[in-house]
Amino acid sequence: MQPMPLLLRQSLRSSANFARTSLPIRPQFLPAAGPNIRPARDIQRSFSVCVRCQFRSQSPSYSSPEKDTLKDDAATRQSKDASSTLTPRDESPKVEPDAETQRPSPAAGEQDTLQGFDQDAKNEPKREPAEKKGLPSYLEERRSQLSKQFTEMMDNLQSNIFVAGQRLNDLTGYSAIEALKKDIQLQEERLREARQRVREAKDAYAAAINRRSASQREVNELLQRKHAWSAADLERFTHLYRNDHTNEVAEMETQDALSAAERESEEAAAQLSKSILSRYHEEQVWSDKIRRMSTWGTWGLMGVNVLLFLVFQIAVEPWRRKRLVKGFEEKVIEAIEKEKAINHIEILKPQPALTSTSPSSKEEAAEPTPTSTATKDTPTTDENTPAATDEAITSEPVVWDSDPTPTIVTNITPETATETTEDSAPKSATINLVEPRKPHLSRILPPLPPSTSLDSWRQTLNELFSDRSMVITQRDLTTVTLQSAAAGAAIMGLVIALIRPR
């Protein structure tokens, strides 16, 4: 007896054979007895026996590339399944084509072309339809990540603010006061309910009293006409006499309920008053703590401001002043060097003309009455200061002629080129270019920061309270005024806070 999986496999094979035999068999082409009516096309044969699959593989240009690839994959899977189901036991008819009827396989170049077309179709970007571009989902997909994060942050802004406020309340201790507020609200609701129960108990007690009073009045009326009772009056009297005890018990119960409701209402009112007083006390303590923290915070800010002021006045301002002075000195020195370079160039330009003059011009220049031309900008000489003469000699270029004696030339023009004598060179013809600028620099440059000695600090304090006239801008004056006003207000507030009676 065969197992169940084998029987199922044989049944599936037989059904596949029946399906194969039901398909029409392609007719064979007869041998070529005459000219072919239809030229043979190079068709890329598939290993599938399905005619529809062959048709799909032959016409890839009639449909979109993506659909063709999907259909080809499905056909390939179907052909694989069909080929796997075929076994040597199947006795399906097989058609052996002749050698003449076999068609040649397509060339390798055509296969490469078809594969290139399929690859291009796969790599082609998917085009979005025009009607889809206006949909909200399409716009949502095209939004940037930053925009999405910003939108999410704005959506959660209210909750974030609430959470931040809750954290601040936890830090400052106001959360306990919030809990007291909620407790007070619950107690107020409890007090309202207790008062409502008191009113209901009063109404029930009053109704019980009225009901018992009415019963007693009716009993009294019946007793007054006792000699004339009828059967109905006797039955009524017995009924009222039985209900009198019930009415008395109901009256006592309603009275007890009223007393309990009144006690509960009083307890709720007392608890509410106690909670309100506790909340008031806690809020006072919290406000004192916040006020104390704000006072210390104000003192801390004032200390930071004073510290920054001292740091700027002691460290930053001298450094900035020194840097400005250094930069100004560098610019002045650079300007002086540029002026020296210009004068040097002007002096060296006519030198070839002097060396190429004739002996007659040299004799005329060596006459006992030399003339020296000086410009209006030439400074005066100073014979009493040897240091100034040295600086002048080093700053002024010296022109050497055939005569070994050096001569200092102040200003030489191409028209009048003269030489100074030997006696006027080192002593009387020294030109000082740096000395006239020193008083000017001393007037412009700001004073350097004082040293750390006691005399220097005393001198600085004396200068702070001296009668020296200074130039100040309106901005600096306004800044100093505002700082003084703020400092005065802070000091007065501190004094008032210290001397204020508790």
Swiss-Prot record:
Quaternary data: Homooligomer.
A biological process from GO: inner mitochondrial membrane organization
Protein name: Sensitive to high expression protein 9 homolog, mitochondrial
Chain segments annotated as transmembrane: 296-316, 479-499
Cellular location(s): Mitochondrion inner membrane
Organism of provenance: Neosartorya fischeri (strain ATCC 1020 / DSM 3700 / CBS 544.65 / FGSC A1164 / JCM 1740 / NRRL 181 / WB 181) (Aspergillus fischerianus)
Gene: she9
Basic and acidic residues composition-biased segments: 65-80, 88-101, 119-140
Topological domains annotated Mitochondrial intermembrane: 317-478
Keyword Membrane (UniProt): yes
Cellular component GO terms, alphabetical: mitochondrial inner membrane
Keywords: Coiled coil, Membrane, Mitochondrion, Mitochondrion inner membrane, Transit peptide, Transmembrane, Transmembrane helix
Keyword Transit peptide applies: yes
Chain intervals for the UniProt region annotation (Disordered): 58-140, 350-407
Highest taxon in the source lineage: Eukaryota
Coiled coil: 139-275
